[in-house]
């Protein structure tokens, strides 16, 4: 097994959101919030904002709403 595999996998993450666009947008927006000082909503050893955001999505600690203008 390749040790560089991302956990959770993209396949698993896509089961929790509508599509890849939503996944990327959610991850980017949440990572930006974390960089700006928001507290992590999950327990994780990593300090990397993208890793934390992905874990939050995987654990369904954050939600999203699709609006006409995009993702909120």
From Swiss-Prot:
Signal peptide: none annotated. It comes from the Bacteria. GO terms for cellular component: DNA-directed RNA polymerase complex. It catalyses: RNA(n) + a ribonucleoside 5'-triphosphate = RNA(n+1) + diphosphate. InterPro entries: DNA-dir_RNA_pol_omega (IPR003716), Pol_omega/Rpo6/RPB6 (IPR006110), RPB6/omega-like_sf (IPR036161). The keyword Transcription applies. Gene3D superfamilies: 3.90.940.10. One of its GO terms (molecular function) is DNA binding. Belongs to the RNA polymerase subunit omega family. The RNAP catalytic core consists of 2 alpha, 1 beta, 1 beta' and 1 omega subunit. When a sigma factor is associated with the core the holoenzyme is formed, which can initiate transcription. HAMAP family: RNApol_bact_RpoZ. This is DNA-directed RNA polymerase subunit omega. It comes from Clostridium kluyveri (strain ATCC 8527 / DSM 555 / NBRC 12016 / NCIMB 10680 / K1).
């Amino acid at each position: 097994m390749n040790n560089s595999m991302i956990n959770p996998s993209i396949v698993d993450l896509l089961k929790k959101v509508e599509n890849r666009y939503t996944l990327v947008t959610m991850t980017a927006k949440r990572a930006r919030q974390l960089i700006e000082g928001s507290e992590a909503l999950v327990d994780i050893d990593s300090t990397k904002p993208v890793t934390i955001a992905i874990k939050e999505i995987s654990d369904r600690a954050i939600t999203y709403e699709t609006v006409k203008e995009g993702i909120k």
